[in-house]
C-alpha cells in the first residue's frame, strides 16, 4: 500500500510542476464533495471521510453529490451522519441482501422482461428510507422538504434518464417533489441487475443507474451560483466557449436574466475508485497502459466493453480535474462483489485513508502549487 501511495505522490508532484500557478488561499476551501459510483468498493469512502473529519474539512462542507454507491454516501453525509456512523453502517450491511429476488424463477423472469432488471431493488430503497428517517423522522421526505428545514447539507444525486438519453440531477432546485429515497434507488439501479424505475418526477420516463452516463459528476457544481467565494473560480478555455454560446443565445432571445456562467469550481473535492494502474495512467501522461491479449470472441467482447466503460468514465473530464480529485485504489475489488469479506472491507477503508492522506499531503506542501 505504501508503495502505491508514494507512486501517486510522485506523479502528483511531477504533474503540478508543469501546471499553472494559482492564487494562494487558506489551508482548505472545500465546500462541495462528489462521490463516484463503485458499488461495494464505496466502503473505501469510510476511510476518506475519517481523514476529512480529522482535518476539519467535513464540518465545512455545504453540498454533497454522488452516483450509485456514491449516492448512498452522499445522502448519509448530507443528513449529518458522522464518519464513524457511516463506517458502522457500511460495515454492518450484508450486501447480499441487495440481491432481493422473488424466490421464484418465473417471477424474476417476468420482472426482468417488464421492469428490465432481475432484482427488485426494494431492499436498498427501504434501507435508505430507514437511514433518512433516523435523521429527519420522515423516511419519505422530499428534496424540498429537506431543504426547507435548513439544517442539512444540500444533496445532489445522479441518475440516467433512458427516455431522453441524458443524465438527470436530482436536487431540491431541480426535482423538489422527488423523495430522496427514490432518487437514491434510481442512482444505484445497475441496468439489468436491478429493476429500472419508471414514472418518477411526474413523467413516464425510465430511469437507471446514474453511473451509466455520469459516474463521476465532478463538474456538477461548476456554475457561478455555486461559489461561496469568487476567488475560488478558475476561468478555463473549455468553459469560455460554452459561456460565449450561452451569452449569444441570451442576446438573441433578449433575456434579462443574468447568465449563470460555467466556472472551474476549486471548492469542489471529488473521490474516485479505480485500480492502481488506472490511477497511474490517468495522472501520468507518460505512463504506458498494459495491453490486453485479444485472441477470441470472448476476449474481444470483454476488451470492447471495458474500453467503452473507461471512455464513459473519463470522456467528460479535463486535464485539470485531477487537481480536485482524490483517487482511491479499489484493490481489484468489483462493484458487485457482494460476498466481500471483512478483511477486504478493512483493506478498502485503509486504502481510502491512505490515498486521502496522500492527496492532502500534496495539497498542503508549500513547495508545490496545488489547486488553491
Where are the regions a protein language model picked out?
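Gly/Ala-rich beta-loop-alpha elbow adjacent to hydrolase catalytic centers
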Residues: 66, 70
